[in-house]
């Protein structure tokens, strides 16, 4: 995931109108007027990471899924907010090798417009999920 995101010390307004800092950390506490330290943004990531790991663990089955699948689901959840309880998460939980999973990684729109960066990210995520680099 670190190759898909850039760690920012200065808050940036994202395409949804929220200020983010570090690795896409957004919260009402993010102050757009200040620069954060490496330690602060690393701490934000550790907090956020735990939340998304817990979310992916809701659908993850270590008997039938591998680490690559977990990591790809984590990246997807980190990007969109969650994966458990979604149509994609439910499909993965039912059958992590279902070909229809490819279709869900086509979510590439931001505010109704196709986002070229998101297209590339989703391609990397789904290819990683299915073991294709």
Where are these regions (language model features)?
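Short, functionally critical alpha-helical segments immediately adjacent to catalytic or ligand/cofactor-binding
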Residues: 1-6, 70-78
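Long, amphipathic alpha-helical surface segments
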Residues: 2-18, 25, 30, 36, ...
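Short, structured surface segments that line ligand/substrate-binding pockets
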Residues: 58-68, 72, 76
């Amino acid at each position: 995931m670190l190759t898909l995101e850039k760690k920012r010390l200065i808050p940036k307004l994202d395409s949804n109108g929220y200020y983010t800092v570090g690795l896409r950390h957004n919260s009402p506490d993010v102050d757009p007027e200040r620069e954060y330290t490496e330690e602060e943004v690393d701490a934000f990531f550790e907090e956020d990471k735990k939340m998304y790991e817990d979310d992916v663990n809701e659908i993850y089955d270590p008997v039938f899924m591998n680490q690559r699948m977990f990591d790809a689901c984590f990246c997807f959840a980190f990007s969109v907010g969650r994966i458990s309880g979604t149509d994609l998460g439910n499909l993965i939980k039912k059958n992590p090798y279902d070909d229809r999973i490819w279709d869900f990684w086509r979510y590439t729109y931001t505010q109704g417009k196709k986002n070229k960066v998101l297209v590339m990210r989703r391609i990397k995520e789904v290819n990683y999920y299915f073991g294709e680099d």
